[in-house]
Amino acid sequence: MSTNNNKAPTSQSSDKSATTESKLNDNENTETETKTDENNEEKPKMTLKPPQPKIENKVSTIDRVVPSVKYPKSLPLPHDVLFNEDKTINLPKLQEHFFAEGRLNHDDVIEIVKMAAEILEKEPTLIQVEAPITVCGDTHGQFYDLIKIFENDIGGNPANTNYLFLGDYVDRGYFSMEVIIYLYACKINYPNTFFLLRGNHECRHLTEYFTFKEECLHKYSEEVYDFITESFNALPLAALMNGKFLCIHGGLSPDIKTLDDIANIDRFKEPPSSGPMCDLLWSDPMEEFSPEIREHFVPNDVRGCSYLYSYRAVCSFLQKNKLLSVIRAHEAQNAGYKMHLQNDATGFPSVITLFSAPNYLDAYNNKGAVLRYENNVMNIRQFTCSPHPYWLPNFMDVFTWSMPFVSEKVAEMLLVLLNLCNDEEAEKNENAQTVKDTSEEEKRRQMLRAKVKSVSKMMRMFSLLRQERETIMMIKSFSPSRKIPQGLLTEGKDALKKALGDFAQARKMDLINEKRPPILDRVNSRGELLRMNSRGELFRINSKGDLFRSNSYADLKPPQGPQETIKITECHEQNITTNNINPNSITTNENNSNEQLQQQQQQQQQQQPPTTTSTTTQTEVAK
């Protein structure tokens, strides 16, 4: 009987527990918990959960809002993945890592720079390169366009293609570190087929003034910057391609008469502001490139240093050194290349300019181009820009970027307060109709109206700053003072868009940045302050304040060259054909008329149509 009495309550308790659990399961905001008492009977305990609000269209804070944009690599590439067992670089892994905005270990970057510099130091100042080869112009920190060059239908894979780069790998673009490290890695892997020349931006002076140093400090450290700028001193200055073409970054110099003059330059130093080394990096062909210009060299006012060289200067140099042409970079071109007036003695373009940074600064809307020289045929292959990750201008953080948004809201609140005061003043005047305005009250109302107008104008400017932030930052990058031109904001959105219209306008705005930046005050070994005035004259100031002229820079007076007359010929930018050229005598068959050249152009276009990824221009060179 006692047993039955004990079982009955247990059964009833179990039934109650089951009923309670059933009810609790119907309620999402409750939880059940079992608790054992002294008689080993389980009693349910109910815990209430706070009500959960129903949110539609939830946005995860873990997943990307734009799924197509992948996360940047958060960890550096491991050392054993970056380096192969034979101490070469794993280029596919490095490219993949850089493509995902990844970075390297600090020590690995320094090791790559040291290895590349050791190879470059052993090369002569004037290197010899042979065809087949791909020649590239400026890349300026555009890593994603650099990788496009290495595609098979443009420049070719560096593993089985000879390459010659003409300098300007850093500054202006936001991926200069990736460009220089990847090029150095290619040099380490292919030291005998991958060649790098020095450009005017490969120096401490310009990288401090433009973006490269800031990028190094943002991504790595000042120690990395010091190692890289030191490695720039090891880059050769010129290359002789197949014994026929002089390849340099900038151009000719009045101090350079022969190829030996280039080979004898001491390049292991920071480029000076004058002299043959400076001219190889900074000089440009004249805008009016014709035989009518009798001077050979004139000061280069656009660059603020070096010279502009004429058609006569180039032809004289080519004839004396038995060359066909000068291949250079240094200047942005809308088509990615420019074939200057052809040499009357050879029928070949006297100067060829290459520029391999498409849509330069994300503003020029230009094409990039490389020159492929193979089997005595030159193919100029054009290509367009590749999409790349977005960086805020000058590596700006989001708080600085958001200041126009905050300022606009503050201006709106201030305007509301001032308008409120103005409305109260008007209401007060309506109630006091019989009282005439005194001069002080009228003056106060005018001041209040002026404040409202000023704040309204300021609010419109902040609104424009917010809406056109990217355009304004691009205009700032073109300005040497890094400021918006005065009055441009008040002209509105259309004026900003017009300021960044086409290639010609962008280049005109950016022209000031093509000038050699002023030398900052420095202290020499004697503790004297070195300072340059606006005319480019260098002075030193001692501890007493005495001023002395420094003789560190040579006079820029242009030399007078020979005054021979040369027949004017027209340069055809496509399908220039020369027959029976002997490099020793530099003679040519001049029987080809313009009509024949046009017919040859049509025939070659039919034989080799351009691909969808590049535009091909062919130039044949006789053996």
Curated annotation (Swiss-Prot):
BP term (GO), one: sorocarp stalk cell differentiation
Binding site for Fe cation: D138, H140, D168
Entry PTM: The N-terminus is blocked.
Comp. bias intervals (Basic and acidic residues): 32-45
Keywords: Calmodulin-binding, Coiled coil, Hydrolase, Iron, Metal-binding, Protein phosphatase, Zinc
Subunit structure, as described in the record: Forms a complex composed of a catalytic and calmodulin-dependent subunit, calcineurin A, and a regulatory Ca(2+)-binding subunit, calcineurin B. In response to an increase in Ca(2+) intracellular levels, forms a complex composed of canA/calcineurin A, cnbA/calcineurin B and calA/calmodulin. Interacts (via calcineurin B binding domain) with regulatory subunit cnbA/calcineurin B. Interacts (via calmodulin-binding domain) with calmodulin; the interaction depends on calmodulin binding to Ca(2+).
Residue numbers spanned by region Autoinhibitory segment: 459-466
UniProt keyword 4Fe-4S present: no
Modulation of this protein's activity: Activated by Ca(2+)-bound calmodulin following an increase in intracellular Ca(2+). At low Ca(2+) concentrations, the catalytic subunit (also known as calcineurin A) is inactive and is bound to the regulatory subunit (also known as calcineurin B) in which only two high-affinity binding sites are occupied by Ca(2+).
Domain free text: The autoinhibitory domain prevents access to the catalytic site.
InterPro entries the UniProt entry points to: Calcineurin-like_PHP_ApaH, Metallo-depent_PP-like, MPP_PP2B, PP2B, Ser/Thr-sp_prot-phosphatase
Comp. bias (Polar residues): 1-22
Named cofactor requirement(s): Fe(3+); Zn(2+)
Annotated catalysed reactions: O-phospho-L-seryl-[protein] + H2O = L-seryl-[protein] + phosphate; O-phospho-L-threonyl-[protein] + H2O = L-threonyl-[protein] + phosphate
Protein name in the entry: Serine/threonine-protein phosphatase 2B catalytic subunit
EC number per UniProt: 3.1.3.16
Stretch list, region Catalytic: 104-389
Autoinhibitory domain: region residues: 500-520
Coiled-coil ranges from the UniProt annotation: 422-460
Site, Interaction with PxVP motif in substrate: residue positions: W401
Gene3D superfamilies: 3.60.21.10
Region (Disordered), start-end ranges: 1-53, 577-623
Enzyme class: hydrolase
